[in-house]
Amino acid sequence: MGSCGGKHTGKGAPKPYSRNFTDPWRKTPGRLFGTALIRFYQITLSSLIGNSCRHLPTCSEYAYEAIARHGLWRGGWMGFFRVVRCGPFGTHGFDPVPRELSPDLKWYMPWRYWRCSASRIGK
């Protein structure tokens, strides 16, 4: 039997598992603060509340990715409105974070982020 030298390459290399966004993103103070809040919620409160999200990715995963991709202000509003849409009479199903936001989503009009989802924007 061979021993593992710790250097995996190729197809057999183990991949780190994370339920959160793993692409590279700018580590600004606002983004780090927002993603840290989401991660704190995932580790502590989420286990007490249980699996109650009606979407995929879950609302906390969505908020984490939205903040990582689009910053604390835009991503925070997107995450907030996603949680609001997740109620009993709200939406459900696959609803990923859009890769790019349309130019009509201005920072001073956060109510427009209500309709912000990849399926609605088409990206």
Curated annotation (Swiss-Prot):
User: What are the record keywords, sorted?
Assistant: Cell inner membrane, Cell membrane, Membrane
Q: List the disulfide bonds.
A: none
For this record, the Gene Ontology CC terms, alphabetical, are:
plasma membrane
Q: How does it sit in the membrane?
A: Peripheral membrane protein
Q: Where is this region: Disordered?
A: 1-23
Summarize the protein's role: Could be involved in insertion of integral membrane proteins into the membrane.
Q: Which family does it belong to?
A: Belongs to the UPF0161 family.
**What's the name of the protein?**
Putative membrane protein insertion efficiency factor
